Amino acid sequence: LASLAPGKDNPVIVIAVSEESATYKPEMDWLADRLQLMGHRVFSLHTNEVFPLGGGLYFDIEGNPEKIDVVYRFFELFDLANIKTSHFIIEAWENGEIALDPPLRPFFEEKSTLALFHHHLLREFWRESISKKSRIILDSLIPKSWIVDPSPLPPGAAIDGPLAQGRQLHSWMDLAEASQKERNLVLKISGFHETAWGSRGVVIGNDVSKEEWASSLTEACDRADSHLHVIQEFRKSIRLSHPLYSMDGEVYEASGRLRLNPYYFVNGDKVELAGALATFCPPDKKIIHGMEDGGDATVFCY
């Protein structure tokens, strides 16, 4: 983060934590305290503790305004409307008064972009744009994905997607008649929405009744103009054993499912894998995410 302010020997870095992310504030406080002991000027603040002054962005230290050089954004873009100081932060960044990281890249919120990788009209484009080695890796990582587009088709046309009763779809609502085996699919909302994170808007086809599946498909089609949905082949996460601490501090071996969230830093034209967040969840959870009964661990890459 300090490298984002190359003109400063010891820049002032603020970790700005929103109310929506407040459960992580104690961890950020701990991290900032440790970095301060190492001589770095790093501060963990709530987003409402920063304020504008003379075009720059500041916070209060014992009654004195301290100018901020770098803001680590610990808030989501979908939550901007609920953050009173967000326009001050963005304005200071636009004016070159602060560096902001992670960068504002809303396209990362769109699950629908995953469907573009498997789109039959884009196969030649990916062959020309991505190396064979990279395509093989991406093909193994990205499950087959389709955008739920309810636009009517000509009578002789079919959707390039999953099957229902062994037949191609003419409408996404045809998928309501799919067998339970064919419903090994997951329906997700894409983009900015309160249900688009934390698995709130996720429906696994063979895990709900036929009626619930049909209702979810109807909702996805009805909301296509404002909030796109995607359907993906459902893949279970890996199951493995890992040592955990019990409430009394004893170590025991537990079975669970693992999710890895990689974190990358972009330095100029170079992209570096900095680490990953490993989430170890109970084995009975089909949908895994940051949850109270799961354990998080940070994996650093050197």
Model regions and ranges:
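Domain-scale recognition of functional cores that engage charged ligands
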Residues: L1-Y302
